[in-house]
Each structure stands twice: as C-alpha cells, then as structure tokens.
C-alpha cells in the first residue's frame, strides 16, 4: 500500500484549510482502504489568525499534523521546509503539495494518483487548461508564461499541485532553488522525460478573494526565471543586441521601452536569485516551534 503525504502550506486561512480537509476526507470515502495510506502535513507559516477548533470527524485520512513555524517565511519556503521535514521524519512513497484555498481541486486527487500508480517512476504535474480568475489576471499570467518560455526555454504550466515520488523529493531538498521557487526547482531538478501531466482546472477560492496580487504574480514569475539565471542572462543579451540592431537609426523613448523592461527584468531576477540560500534551507527545520496533531 502506497504511503502518501499531502503537504499544505497555510497563512491566516484556516477556514479554507478545514474546508479542504473535509472535502479530501469525503472524497476518500468511496476509495478502497487498500488503495493508499493518505495523511496530511500542514505547515503553518506563523499565522496570526488563531486556528479554530475542529468539529469534523475525519474518517478516511489516517493522520493530520500541523507544523507551527516561529517566523513567517512565505509560501514557497513553507513547501520547501515541509518537503524537508517529510523526507527526514516520515516513511513515504509520494508527496502531493496542495494550496489550502481550494484552487487546487481535491476532486482531481484521484486522477493524479491513478496517473502516479500507472507511472510510478515519474513526477505527475497538474497542468492548467482552464483558470478561474478574471481577464486581467489571465492576461498577465499568459504574459508570464510566454516570457518564461522566451527567456529561459522552460514551459512551466503547473504550480504546486503535483505528485512527487521519493526520488524527486530527494533531488529537490538538495537544490537551493527549492527554497525560492517550487515550480522552477522542479523544472530544474527533474528532467522533462521524468515528468508527465494530467489536465487540471483551476478551482475557485473557498473564501475571500485571491491572495495572488499583480505584484506577487510578477515576483512569482521572476523567481522562476531566477532559477535559470544563466540562460536568462544569455537570452537577454541576445535579445538586446538583436533589438538594438533592428532599431538603430530609429531610437526614441518608445523604442527604448523594451530595452528598459528587459534590463529591469534581468536585474530583478538576479536580485531574487539571492533567495536561493542552501544554508537557510538546510536549517529550515530549526524554525519549527511546535507540532500539533489534529488526528
């Protein structure tokens, strides 16, 4: 029987977390008990919101633990610390990182695991084919996706919602990029031939508006690019040389905008690449204040 850990980072969104846990538990009711041993690890990123008392009886999930962090480190670093904790403290076959807010749909867990059982030596990513956000966010996300392809050569259609075999977890916890960008690190550490995907529809948040602001989307995009900073630097230089050659004799404030944009992007990505700190990552479990057991 496969031992599966669902990894959920959370910051001040306990209502969504418990809604997600209830939906996962109810969804597992129809599963044969011999299919998988599924437990949950929640990484509490030093939430200021008090965790509510749970009144729901979990029947299908085998265990639910909450790691309480001393200091807030951010979403990506919560996942990184969670992967490290699972690797060092748990016997597991697969890890499934999920966002707590409902945008990673628990209804797709079965599809994800079926694919993982079919291809046990591959990472399974949930690639977005449909998003639930408004037009402006969708446009910005599309721009992020194509800029990432153009300047890094990486087509990253997935977020945190993935199914990671043990080999992938071991590779990711030994790479500093995981401390800054989960999806960027996955693309870097696991070869494309060792990855496959399922089609995924982005769910709607259980409660409240999305916390992914325009600024956070830019930071997210640049953090992915920063993982491939050498490729980014080379392609940016090629772009700038080619573009300057094409506009020579027609230089104006308007034609200089793309140059300034690419230079700004490059500098910002290089600054963000300094977040990839292996020493901090290795010591991340020292940030654990306590561990609570919900089940």
Segments from the language model and where they lie:
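Catalytic donor/gating beta->alpha subdomain of glycosyltransferases that bind UDP-sugars
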Residues: 170-232
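Short acidic donor-binding loop at the edge of a beta-strand
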Residues: 90-94
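Acceptor/aglycone-binding surface of glycosyltransferases and processive sugar-polymer synthases
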Residues: 69-71, 75-85, 97, 103-180, ...
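Cell-envelope/extracellular polymer assembly enzymes that use nucleotide-activated donors
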Residues: 3-5, 39
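Short beta-strand/loop segment that forms part of the nucleotide-sugar
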Residues: 32-47, 67-68
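Short, well-formed alpha-helical segments that are part of the catalytic scaffolds
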Residues: 13-30
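Terminal low-complexity segments of carbohydrate-biosynthetic enzymes
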Residues: 231-295
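A conserved acidic beta->alpha catalytic loop
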Residues: 41-53, 102-103
């Amino acid at each position: 029987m496969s031992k599966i850990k669902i990894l959920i980072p959370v910051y001040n969104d306990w209502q969504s977390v418990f809604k997600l846990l209830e939906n996962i538990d109810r969804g597992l009711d129809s599963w044969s008990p011999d299919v998988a041993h599924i437990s949950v690890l929640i990484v509490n990123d030093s939430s200021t919101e008090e965790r509510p008392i749970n009144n729901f009886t979990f029947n299908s999930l085998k265990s639910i633990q909450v790691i309480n962090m001393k200091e807030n480190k951010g979403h990506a670093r919560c996942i990184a610390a969670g992967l490290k904790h699972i690797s060092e403290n748990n016997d597991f076959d697969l890890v499934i990182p999920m966002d707590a807010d409902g945008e990673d749909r628990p209804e797709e867990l079965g599809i994800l695991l079926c694919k993982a059982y079919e291809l046990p030596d591959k990472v399974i990513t949930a690639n977005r084919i449909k998003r639930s956000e408004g037009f402006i966010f969708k446009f910005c996300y599309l721009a992020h996706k194509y800029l990432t392809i153009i300047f890094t050569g990486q087509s990253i259609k997935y977020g945190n919602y993935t199914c990671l075999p043990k080999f992938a977890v071991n590779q990711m916890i030994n790479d500093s990029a995981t401390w800054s960008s989960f999806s960027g690190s996955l693309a870097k550490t696991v070869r494309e031939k060792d990855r496959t995907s399922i089609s995924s529809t982005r769910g709607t948040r259980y409660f409240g508006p999305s916390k992914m602001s325009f600024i956070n989307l830019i930071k997210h995009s640049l953090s992915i690019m920063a993982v491939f900073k050498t490729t980014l630097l080379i392609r940016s230089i090629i772009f700038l040389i080619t573009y300057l050659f094409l506009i020579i004799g027609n230089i104006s404030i308007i034609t200089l905008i793309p140059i300034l944009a690419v230079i700004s992007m490059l500098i910002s990505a290089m600054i963000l690449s300094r977040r990839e700190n292996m020493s901090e990552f290795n010591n991340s479990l020292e940030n654990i204040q306590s561990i609570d057991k919900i089940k």
